[in-house]
């Protein structure tokens, strides 16, 4: 075996180990509460959510990728059904201080979704996201089932765990 092939194999093993380690950490992670407000100014807490699954969707009103994720999730039959059957709560979170911009864009989201604003940026201490959109799926006990994932992965998860 040539040295370059061995280096490639070693690198693949290393990257696989890093990926497995990341997945194992995510499997034991908990989603954590932070300061949130609804559009009417009321405080909101993750502890108030009683559905078996919660999708934390960090988004930004000016983000084109966020618009695509919103479309994908809102058009997905399995997401709509899970929300309608009270199996899933979709919680959109705008991390920012432009409340007027946020409120002007709330009509982009399905009425069954819960929309909150983190105008104190408190979620930045508890969640890693480099840029919106960022999705976290958690279970009833607030265990992170999927961390920093895609809409496609959320939909696939819901399809495989239906019923």
PLM segments and residue spans:
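Bacterial Sec-dependent N-terminal signal peptides
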Residues: 1-31
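N-terminal "domain-start" segment that seeds a small globular fold
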Residues: 26-48
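Short acidic-hydrophobic, aromatic-tinged amphipathic segments that line or gate anion-handling sites
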Residues: 37, 114-119, 148-149
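Short active-site neighborhood of thiol/selenol oxidoreductases, capturing the structured segment around
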Residues: 46-67, 91
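Conserved helix-turn-beta segment immediately C-terminal to the redox Cys motif
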Residues: 52-53, 68-92
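Thiol-/selenol-based redox modules, centered on thioredoxin-like
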Residues: 81, 139-163
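Thiol-based oxidoreductase modules, predominantly thioredoxin-like and allied folds used
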Residues: 85-100, 111-121
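Short, internal strand/loop/helix patches
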Residues: 103-138
């Amino acid at each position: 075996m040539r040295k370059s092939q061995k280096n490639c194999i070693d690198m693949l093993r290393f990257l696989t180990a890093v990926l497995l380690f990341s997945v194992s950490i995510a499997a034991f992670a908990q989603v954590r509460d932070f300061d949130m407000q609804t559009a009417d100014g009321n405080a909101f807490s993750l502890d108030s959510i009683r559905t078996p699954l919660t999708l934390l969707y960090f988004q930004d009103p000016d983000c084109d990728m966020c618009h695509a994720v919103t479309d994908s999730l809102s058009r997905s039959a399995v997401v709509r059904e899970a929300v309608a059957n009270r199996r899933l709560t979709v919680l959109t979170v705008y991390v920012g201080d432009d409340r007027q911009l946020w409120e002007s864009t709330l009509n982009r989201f399905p009425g069954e979704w819960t929309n909150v604003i983190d105008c104190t940026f408190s979620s930045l201490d508890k969640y890693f996201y480099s840029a919106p959109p960022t999705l976290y799926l958690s279970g009833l006990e607030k265990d992170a089932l999927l961390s920093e994932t895609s809409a496609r992965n959320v939909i696939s998860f819901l399809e495989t765990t239906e019923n």
